[in-house]
């Protein structure tokens, strides 16, 4: 039986480059790995996790879905399980923003023009991940807001171009989520955090002015 994906992983699956190998890093129970493998759209599907326990559960998920022969499971830390050029897309779902960029930093081959598409679903600190990616030469392909288990997530796809940009606070806060029907709900959720964030920003600073403008728009 094929596992059912929540809104986060469904959106992530839709952003994977078809016709190219894909890796699901931090695959946990292997639900996304199984769905990708069963689709037949990818010549190679790799599921990887740092811990043997989740990897064993991923194997069981693949067996139950009848696609164990169409996926490869690897035990290892982050992108160390991959070699440069091996996959066209890498999914990093369910880890923090900081963990995501630390994983990327440890694999310099990712930050190359023509490198893999990164599909990320940060569990926290969406704004900080957007800023880090843009400041390190990645360009936005998609930024989709989704709601799962009562929380908002941003499913981001980025590719390296080498063009470094310095985004505004507003760009980091909302990304390109406004083009989606769910964008208004995501924006309201992000804005709700601002009063607390604003407390630590000195009055009169450019950041304070930008935050105040966003708060005023929301009233």
Regions inferred by a protein language model and the residue ranges of each:
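S-adenosyl-L-methionine
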Residues: 1-20, 34, 56-85
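Short SAM/SAH-binding signature in class I
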Residues: 86-94
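Conserved SAM-binding motif I beta-strand of class I
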Residues: 44-49
